C-alpha cells in the first residue's frame, strides 16, 4: 500500500515538473515572440494554468483521499465554487503580504499579482485538491504532528518549500545585474 | 553584590569588543604620515643649475616670479557646471533653465573676449570632499586621508609645509577674509584677516556680506600681496535649499558681480584665481566621491595675456592640487615640500607672442623643478615610513633619472632640442602622474597584522558572549571568581606590556595596550570555562541558536559582504524583519500554541495533544503579525536613498517643514506631526493606566502626568517656530530666535529632570494600608435631618450600624497594637516595565526634537512596532515560574533588526554626506562657537537615536512575558459559566504575580539579565565582526572607501552607543530592583512596629 502510494507520488511530481517544462516550450508554437525573459508575464499565466490543470487531472485520476464520502452534484458544485473563492482569496492575501513585504503599491501591481497567482498555484491549489476547502484541515496539516498520510506529508513539504523558494527569490534583487528585466524593474 | 557583578561582567565583555574594534580600526583607517620638512629658497629641490631665466633677478626663488600678486577667490561648493558657459549655439533648443546654470556670465564673457587671458578648468577633487580637507589639499598640495574626515568640527593647525607658510616666510603680506576654518588651519599667518563664523549653514549671507564689506577697500588700499576671500553662501545655500532653489540663482549672481568687480580693479601684475573647493550632490550635500561632488570649477584670469592658445571647447580636466605648485612657481616661491600636484605647464609658456621653442623650454623647466621636488619628497617619505611600495618607487626613480638626464642634456646642447623637448615634457609629466597615483594608492594601505588581530579579538568576544550566555543560566555560575580572574590577568598583562615597552623605550600605544589587556584576560576566562563547564557538555549545546533564526542571521551577515546589499540594506532590513515576524507567527502555530487542542488532535488517533493549552487564539497572533508588517512597511516610506542609486527617489517627508513651499500642505503636515506627538503621549499614558501605575502618587508618575504634556507642548511650539521662522515679521525675529533657542533646551532639561526623578524614586506603586480601608469608603452619601419615611429608615439604619462597626474595629485595632496590619500594594506586577517605559519615553522626546518634524510619525511607529513585537514575542515565551528565565534568540535578533530598520526609517544612511548636520543647531541657532563636543553629541544623538532607544529598552524583552501573564489569566478566568465562582474567590488570589515572579527568584533574574545582555551583545558583535571581515577582505574593492569603510565606522559607533545604552538599561532595572527591595524592607519594618 505504502510503496504504491510512494510510486504514485513520484509520478505526480514528475508530471508536475514535466508540465512546467512544457509550459516553456509549447506556447512558442502558438504565440509569436514568446520567451521566458521577454514576455515573462504571459509565461507566468500559462505556467500557472498548466500546473493547475495537471493538479486537477491528477486529483481526479489518483484520488488520494478515497475516504471522502460520495456526495450529490450540488455538493460538488458548491465545493468547486468554494475552491475558486479560496483560490482568489489566497491570491489577494498573498498580494497584500507581498506589498507589506516591500513590493511597490501601485507600480508593477500586475507583476506582483501574477507572482501571487503563481505562488497560489504551487501552494493553495494542491491544498485545495487534497484537503478541499477545509481551513481546519489545512491548519492541522501545517502544524507539528498534524500529518496523517504520506500525501499530506508530501503536501506539507512541497508547500513549505514553495514559500521558502519564493522567499529566497527575493534575495538576489539588490545585486546589480544588468539584465533587461532588471533594468525594466528599476525604471 | 551580584547586581554589580552582572554589570561588571557585561562591561568587561564590552571592553573586549572595544579593544577589538580599536585594534582593527588602527590597522584599517591608516593616516598618512605628515612630514614637517620645509622647502626653502636657498635649497633647490635637486642638483643642477637653477632653471632658465631665474638667474640674477631679485625676489626670484626657484624660478622668477611671473605675478607679484594673486587674488584667490574661493567659492565654497562651486560645482563645475555652476561656472560652465551656457552655449546658445543651438538656436532651436531652448536653453535649460535651472537656477544654477549660466549665472556666472562674466566668466563666459571674459573667456570669449580675452581668450588668451583667461581659462576655465574642471578641477578634479580628491575625496573626502569636506571643506577642511580641501583647504589642506589646496595649500599643501597633498592628499588628506579618510580619517581626517571625522575631524571636520575640530580643525587643527597644518603642520606640513604649505603655500601660506611659504608666503609668510618670503615676507609677502597675506590678507584673508571669510570662512573662519582658516583661522584654525593657519593661526597667526595672515597680516590682516576678517574671519566670519562658518558653522551656521542656515545663514546664507553673513560671511559673504562681511567679505564684500572689506574686499574692495582692502584691494584699493594696496597693502597686500596675496588676497584670499573664501565665500560660503553658495555652500550654505546648497545645504539649506539644495541647488535647485531660486535662492541659489541669487547667490551665484552675487558671486558673478563680485568677480566682475574684481576684474575691473585688477592691475597688470595680478593673477585672479576663482576656485570651488568641491562640488555638491543634487541635494546640496557633499563629503563623498560622487561625480557631482568631485568636480569643481577653477578659473584663472590675468590682465596680461599668459596663455599661448585659445581655450578648448570642452574645459580641460586637471587635478585640484595642481593649483599649488603652479601658484608657488608663478609667485616665485618654493613648491611646498609635500606637494604631489603637477604644475599647469600652459601657464609658464609666456603669453601668446613668445617663441614656441622658448615657451616649451619654460614649461619643461617648471615641470622639471616640480619633478625634482616630488622626487625629493618621495625619497624623504619612503625613508621615514614603509608605506610606499618599493617596486613602484624604484620604477618611478628610474623614470625620473631618465627624464632628468634628458633634461640636462637638452640644456647643454640646444641643437636638436626642438625634437626632444616634447618627449622630455611627456616623461616629466608621466613621472609626476605616476607618483601621484602611487601616493593615492599607498595612503590607503593597511596594517594587515592589526586588522587580523582586531578581527580575531572580535570573533573571540563573540564566542565569549555565546559561551557565557549559555553558561549564565545554568546553576552555579561562578560570578565573582569568573570575573575577577580575567580582570586581574588583564591588568597583569597590561602592566607587563607597559613595563616591557618602558624597558626598551618604545612609545606606548594605547590601542595595543588595550588589545594585550583584552587577550590576557580572555585566555584565563576560556581556560576556566573549559575546566568548569565546557568539558562536561557536548559541544552542540554551545551553539544553541535554532535553525531558522540561524539562517536569517547568516543572511543578515552575508549582506555586509556585498556592496549592492549594503547600499540596499535600507530595504533588505524590513524584508528580513518581516521574515522574522512571519517566522514567529508560523512557529507559534507549528508549536500548537495558537489553536485549541481539539482542532489539532485527530480523534481517530486519540493522541493527547500539547501539554500546555494555547494562551492565545490564532487570530490574535496573526493580527499582531499583520500589524507589525504594516508598521514596518509604513516606516519604510520614510526612506532616504543612498547616492549610488540614481533611479531611487528619497522620501520628500524627510525634509524639515521649513523647506516646504505650500502653506496649506505645511499646516496639514504640522497638524499630523503634532497629532503623532499627542498619540505617542496618549499611548504611553494609556499603557501606564492599564497597568495602574499612573495612579501612583510617586514623583515620576506625577511627572508623566504633568511634565510629559509640557514637553510635548514645548516640542510642538518649537516645530511651529522652526517651520515658520522665515515668514516671521521682522519685529518678531528676536523673539522667535530667542524662543527657538530656549524651547529645545527646556524640553531637554525637563526630560533630564524626569529621568533624575525616575532614578531617585523608581518604585511606582500605590499603597493602601489597612484591611478595612476599602470598606470604610463604602459609607454612602451623608444623610442629615430626621428620617421622614420608611425608605429613609431602611437606608439610614444600616449606615449607622456599619459606622459603629467601623468605629469599634478601629478602636480595637488601636488598642491591640500587635494586630495584623495588611497592606495592599497595587501595580507591583509592572513596576519594572513601568520604569522602563517611562525612561524610554523621556529619552525619546529630546531625540525626537533633534530630527525633522515629520520623523515624529516614525517615532510613533517605532513605539507601536516595538509594542506589537513584544506582545508577539511574549506569546511565544512560556513563563516558567521558578526559573530559570530565558529570552529566546529570535526575540533578541528581531529586536536588533528592528533597531537597524529604525535607523534607516529615521532618514539615515551609513555614509558621511547623509549625516543630519542640522541637529547641531537644535537649541543653538547661532552655532556653538569654539565648542566641538556639544555639536558632535547632538549630531551623534540624532544619528544613533534608534540604537540608543532599542538598547536601553532591551530588558523589556525579559519583562514583557510576565506582563502579558495578566491578560492570559484574566481571559481564562472569565469563561461565561464561572463568573459566580470568580466573584466568590478572594481578590488577592486573583491578582497575578507578574513581574514579582522575577523578584521571587532573584538569582535567576540576574542570570537572565546577564544572559539577555550577552545575547544582545553577541548579535551586535557578529554584525561588527562581519563588517570588519568585509572591510578587510574587500580592502582593494572599488567601493571600499565609499561603502565598506563608512559602513564599518557607522556600525562601530553604533555598537558603542548600543552597548552603553544596554548597560544603562540593565542598570536601570537593577536600580528599580534595589528600590523595590528597600521598599519591601521598609514595609516589613512598618509591619513589625
Swiss-Prot record, chain B:
GO terms for cellular component: endoplasmic reticulum membrane; membrane. Glycans are attached at residue 268. It is found in: Endoplasmic reticulum membrane. Changing residue 370 to S: In HPMRS2; decrease in mannose-ethanolamine phosphotransferase activity; decreased protein expression. Keywords: Disease variant, Endoplasmic reticulum, Glycoprotein, GPI-anchor biosynthesis, Intellectual disability, Membrane, Transferase, Transmembrane, Transmembrane helix. One of its GO terms (molecular function) is mannose-ethanolamine phosphotransferase activity. The chain crosses the membrane at residues 4-24, 457-477, 482-502, 510-530, 541-561, 575-595, 668-688, 701-721, 747-767, 830-850, 857-877, 944-964, 1014-1034, 1048-1068. Changing residue 119 to W: In HPMRS2; decrease in mannose-ethanolamine phosphotransferase activity. It is a multi-pass membrane protein. Its EC number is 2.-.-.-. CDD domains: GPI_EPT_3. InterPro entries: Alkaline_phosphatase_core_sf (IPR017850), Phosphodiest/P_Trfase (IPR002591), PIG-O_N (IPR037675), PIGO/GPI13 (IPR039524). One of its GO terms (biological process) is GPI anchor biosynthetic process. It holds the Pfam family Phosphodiest. Pathway: Glycolipid biosynthesis; glycosylphosphatidylinositol-anchor biosynthesis. Gene3D superfamilies: Alkaline Phosphatase, subunit A. Catalytic subunit of the ethanolamine phosphate transferase 3 complex that transfers an ethanolamine phosphate (EtNP) from a phosphatidylethanolamine (PE) to the 6-OH position of the third alpha-1,2-linked mannose of an alpha-D-Man-(1->2)-alpha-D-Man-(1->6)-2-PEtn-alpha-D-Man-(1->4)-alpha-D-GlcN-(1->6)-(1-radyl,2-acyl-sn-glycero-3-phospho)-2-acyl-inositol (also termed H6) intermediate to generate a 6-PEtn-alpha-D-Man-(1->2)-alpha-D-Man-(1->6)-2-PEtn-alpha-D-Man-(1->4)-alpha-D-GlcN-(1->6)-(1-radyl,2-acyl-sn-glycero-3-phospho)-2-acyl-inositol (also termed H7) and participates in the tenth step of the glycosylphosphatidylinositol-anchor biosynthesis. Part of the ethanolamine phosphate transferase 3 complex composed by PIGO and PIGF. PIGF is required to stabilize PIGO. It is linked to Hyperphosphatasia with impaired intellectual development syndrome 2: An autosomal recessive form of intellectual disability characterized by facial dysmorphism, brachytelephalangy, and persistent elevated serum alkaline phosphatase (hyperphosphatasia). Some patients may have additional features, such as cardiac septal defects or seizures. Belongs to the PIGG/PIGN/PIGO family. PIGO subfamily. This is GPI ethanolamine phosphate transferase 3, catalytic subunit. It comes from Homo sapiens.
Amino acid at each position: 500500500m505504502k510503496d504504491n502510494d510512494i510510486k504514485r507520488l513520484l509520478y505526480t511530481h514528475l508530471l508536475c515538473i514535466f508540465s512546467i517544462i512544457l509550459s516553456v516550450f509549447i506556447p512558442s508554437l502558438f504565440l509569436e515572440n514568446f520567451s521566458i525573459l521577454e514576455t515573462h508575464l504571459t509565461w507566468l499565466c500559462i505556467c500557472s494554468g498548466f500546473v493547475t490543470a495537471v493538479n486537477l487531472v491528477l486529483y481526479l485520476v489518483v484520488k488520494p483521499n478515497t475516504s471522502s464520502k460520495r456526495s450529490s452534484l450540488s455538493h460538488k458544485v458548491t465545493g468547486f465554487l468554494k475552491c475558486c473563492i479560496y483560490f482568489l482569496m489566497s491570491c489577494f492575501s498573498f498580494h497584500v503580504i507581498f506589498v507589506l513585504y516591500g513590493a511597490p503599491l501601485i507600480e508593477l501591481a500586475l507583476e506582483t499579482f501574477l507572482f501571487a497567482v503563481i505562488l497560489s498555484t504551487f501552494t493553495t491549489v494542491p491544498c485545495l485538491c487534497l484537503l478541499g476547502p477545509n481551513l481546519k484541515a489545512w491548519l492541522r496539516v501545517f502544524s507539528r504532528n498534524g500529518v496523517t498520510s504520506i500525501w499530506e506529508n508530501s503536501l506539507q513539504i512541497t508547500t513549505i518549500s514553495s514559500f521558502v523558494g519564493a522567499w529566497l527569490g527575493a534575495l538576489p534583487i539588490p545585486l546589480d545585474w544588468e539584465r533587461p528585466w532588471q533594468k525594466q524593474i528599476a525604471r | 553584590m551580584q547586581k554589580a557583578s552582572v554589570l561588571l561582567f557585561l562591561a568587561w565583555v564590552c571592553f573586549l569588543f572595544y579593544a577589538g574594534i580599536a585594534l582593527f580600526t588602527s590597522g584599517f583607517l591608516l593616516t598618512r604620515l605628515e612630514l614637517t620638512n620645509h622647502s626653502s629658497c636657498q635649497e633647490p629641490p635637486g642638483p643642477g643649475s637653477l632653471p632658465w631665466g631665474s638667474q640674477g633677478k631679485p625676489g626670484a626663488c626657484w624660478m622668477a616670479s611671473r605675478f607679484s600678486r594673486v587674488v584667490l577667490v574661493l567659492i565654497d561648493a562651486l560645482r563645475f557646471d555652476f561656472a560652465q558657459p551656457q552655449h546658445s549655439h543651438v538656436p532651436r533648443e531652448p536653453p535649460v533653465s535651472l537656477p544654477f546654470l549660466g549665472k556666472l556670465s562674466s566668466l563666459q564673457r571674459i573667456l570669449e573676449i580675452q581668450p588668451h587671458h583667461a581659462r576655465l578648468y574642471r578641477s578634479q577633487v580628491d575625496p573626502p570632499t569636506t571643506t577642511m580637507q580641501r583647504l589642506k589639499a589646496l595649500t599643501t598640495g597633498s592628499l588628506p586621508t579618510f580619517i581626517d574626515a571625522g575631524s571636520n568640527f575640530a580643525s587643527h593647525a597644518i603642520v606640513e609645509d604649505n603655500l601660506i607658510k611659504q608666503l609668510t616666510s618670503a615676507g609677502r603680506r597675506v590678507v584673508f577674509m571669510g570662512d573662519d576654518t582658516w583661522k584654525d588651519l593657519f593661526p597667526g599667518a595672515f597680516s590682516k584677516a576678517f574671519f566670519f563664523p562658518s558653522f551656521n549653514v542656515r545663514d546664507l549671507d553673513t560671511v559673504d556680506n562681511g567679505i564684500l564689506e572689506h574686499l574692495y577697500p582692502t584691494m584699493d588700499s594696496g597693502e597686500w600681496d596675496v588676497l584670499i576671500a573664501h565665500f560660503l553662501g553658495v555652500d550654505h545655500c546648497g545645504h539649506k535649499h539644495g541647488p535647485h532653489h531660486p535662492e541659489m540663482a541669487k547667490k551665484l549672481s552675487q558671486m558673478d558681480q563680485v568677480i566682475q568687480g574684481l576684474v575691473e580693479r585688477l592691475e597688470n601684475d595680478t593673477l585672479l584665481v576663482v576656485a570651488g573647493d568641491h562640488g555638491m550632490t543634487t541635494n546640496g550635500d557633499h563629503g563623498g566621491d560622487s561625480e557631482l561632488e568631485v568636480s569643481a570649477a577653477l578659473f584663472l584670469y590675468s590682465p596680461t595675456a599668459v596663455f599661448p592658445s585659445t581655450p578648448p571647447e570642452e574645459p580641460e580636466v586637471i587635478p585640484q592640487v595642481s593649483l599649488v605648485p603652479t601658484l608657488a612657481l608663478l609667485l616665485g616661491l618654493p613648491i611646498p615640500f609635500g606637494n604631489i600636484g603637477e604644475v599647469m605647464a600652459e601657464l609658464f609658456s609666456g603669453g601668446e607672442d613668445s617663441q614656441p621653442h622658448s615657451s616649451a623650454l619654460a614649461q619643461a623647466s617648471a615641470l622639471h623643478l616640480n619633478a625634482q621636488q616630488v622626487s625629493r619628497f618621495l625619497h624623504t617619505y619612503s625613508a621615514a615610513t614603509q608605506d610606499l611600495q618599493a617596486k613602484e618607487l624604484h620604477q618611478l626613480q628610474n623614470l625620473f633619472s631618465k627624464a632628468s638626464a634628458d633634461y640636462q642634456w637638452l640644456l647643454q646642447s640646444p641643437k636638436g632640442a626642438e625634437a626632444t623637448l616634447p618627449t622630455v615634457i611627456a616623461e616629466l609629466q608621466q613621472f609626476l602622474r605616476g607618483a601621484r597615483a602611487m601616493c593615492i594608492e599607498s595612503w590607503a594601505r593597511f596594517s594587515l597584522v592589526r586588522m587580523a588581530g582586531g578581527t580575531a579579538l572580535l570573533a573571540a568576544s563573540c564566542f565569549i558572549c555565546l559561551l557565557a550566555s549559555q553558561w549564565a543560566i545554568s546553576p552555579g555560575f561562578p560570578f565573582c571568581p569568573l570575573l575577577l580572574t580575567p580582570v586581574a590577568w588583564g591588568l597583569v598583562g597590561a602592566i607587563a606590556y607597559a613595563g616591557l615597552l618602558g624597558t626598551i623605550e618604545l612609545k606606548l600605544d594605547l590601542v595595543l595596550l588595550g588589545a594585550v589587556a583584552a587577550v590576557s584576560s580572555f585566555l584565563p576566562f576560556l581556560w576556566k570555562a573549559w575546566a568548569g563547564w565546557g568539558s562536561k557538555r557536548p559541544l552542540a549545546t554551545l551553539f544553541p541558536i535554532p535553525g531558522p533564526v540561524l539562517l536569517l542571521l547568516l543572511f543578515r551577515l552575508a549582506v555586509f559582504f556585498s556592496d549592492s546589499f549594503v547600499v540596499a540594506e535600507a530595504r533588505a532590513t524590513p524584508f528580513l524583519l518581516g521574515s522574522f515576524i512571519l517566522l514567529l507567527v508560523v512557529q507559534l502555530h507549528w508549536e500548537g500554541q495558537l489553536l485549541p487542542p481539539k482542532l489539532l488532535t485527530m480523534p481517530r488517533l486519540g493522541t493527547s495533544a500539547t501539554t500546555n493549552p494555547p494562551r492565545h487564539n490564532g487570530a490574535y497572533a496573526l493580527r499582531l503579525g499583520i500589524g507589525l508588517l504594516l508598521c514596518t512597511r509604513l516606516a519604510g516610506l520614510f526612506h532616504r536613498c543612498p547616492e549610488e542609486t540614481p533611479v531611487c527617489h528619497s522620501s520628500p517627508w524627510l525634509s524639515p517643514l521649513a523647506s516646504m513651499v505650500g502653506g496649506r500642505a505645511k499646516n496639514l503636515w504640522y497638524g499630523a506631526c503634532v497629532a503623532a506627538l499627542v498619540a505617542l503621549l496618549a499611548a504611553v499614558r494609556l499603557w501606564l493606566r492599564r497597568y495602574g501605575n499612573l495612579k501612583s502618587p510617586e514623583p515620576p508618575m506625577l511627572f508623566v502626568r504633568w511634565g510629559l504634556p509640557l514637553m510635548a507642548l514645548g516640542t510642538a511650539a518649537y516645530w511651529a517656530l522652526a517651520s515658520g521662522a522665515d515668514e516671521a515679521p521682522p519685529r518678531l525675529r528676536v523673539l522667535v530666535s530667542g524662543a527657538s533657542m530656549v524651547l529645545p533646551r527646556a524640553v531637554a532639561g525637563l526630560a533630564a529632570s524626569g529621568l533624575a526623578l525616575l532614578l531617585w524614586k523608581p518604585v511606582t506603586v500605590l499603597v493602601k494600608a489597612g484591611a478595612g480601608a476599602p470598606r470604610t469608603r463604602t459609607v454612602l452619601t451623608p444623610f442629615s435631618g430626621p428620617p421622614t419615611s420608611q425608605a429613609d429608615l431602611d437606608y439610614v439604619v444600616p449606615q449607622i450600624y456599619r459606622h459603629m462597626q467601623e468605629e469599634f474595629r478601629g478602636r480595637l485595632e488601636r488598642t491591640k497594637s500587635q494586630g495584623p496590619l495588611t497592606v495592599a500594594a497595587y501595580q507591583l506586577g509592572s513596576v519594572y516595565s513601568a520604569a522602563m517605559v517611562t525612561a524610554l519615553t523621556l529619552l525619546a522626546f529630546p531625540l525626537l526634537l533633534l530630527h525633522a518634524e515629520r520623523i515624529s510619525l516614525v517615532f510613533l511607529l517605532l513605539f507601536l512596532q516595538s509594542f506589537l513585537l513584544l506582545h508577539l514575542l511574549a506569546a511565544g515565551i512560556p513563563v516558567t515560574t521558578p526559573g530559570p528565565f530565558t529570552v529566546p534568540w529570535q526575540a533578541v535578533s528581531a529586536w536588533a533588526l528592528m533597531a537597524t530598520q529604525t535607523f534607516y526609517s529615521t532618514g539615515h544612511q551609513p555614509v558621511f554626506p547623509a549625516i543630519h548636520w542640522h541637529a547641531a543647531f537644535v537649541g543653538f541657532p547661532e552655532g556653538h562657537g569654539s565648542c566641538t563636543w556639544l555639536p558632535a553629541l547632538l549630531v551623534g544623538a540624532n544619528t544613533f537615536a534608534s540604537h540608543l532607544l532599542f538598547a536601553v529598552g532591551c530588558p523589556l524583552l525579559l519583562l514583557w512575558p510576565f506582563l502579558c501573564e495578566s491578560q492570559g489569566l484574566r481571559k481564562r478566568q472569565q469563561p461565561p459559566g464561572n463568573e459566580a465562582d470568580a466573584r466568590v474567590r478572594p481578590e488577592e488570589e486573583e491578582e497575578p504575580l507578574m513581574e514579582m515572579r522575577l523578584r521571587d527568584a532573584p538569582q535567576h533574574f540576574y542570570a537572565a539579565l546577564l544572559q539577555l545582555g550577552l545575547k544582545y551583545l553577541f548579535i551586535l558583535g557578529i554584525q561588527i565582526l562581519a563588517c570588519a571581515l568585509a572591510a578587510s577582505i574587500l580592502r582593494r574593492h572599488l567601493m571600499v572607501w565609499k561603502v565598506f569603510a563608512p559602513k564599518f565606522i557607522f556600525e562601530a559607533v553604533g555598537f558603542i552607543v548600543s552597548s552603553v545604552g544596554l548597560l544603562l538599561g540593565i542598570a536601570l532595572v537593577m536600580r528599580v530592583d534595589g528600590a523595590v527591595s528597600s521598599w519591601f524592607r521598609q514595609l516589613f519594618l512598618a509591619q513589625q512596629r
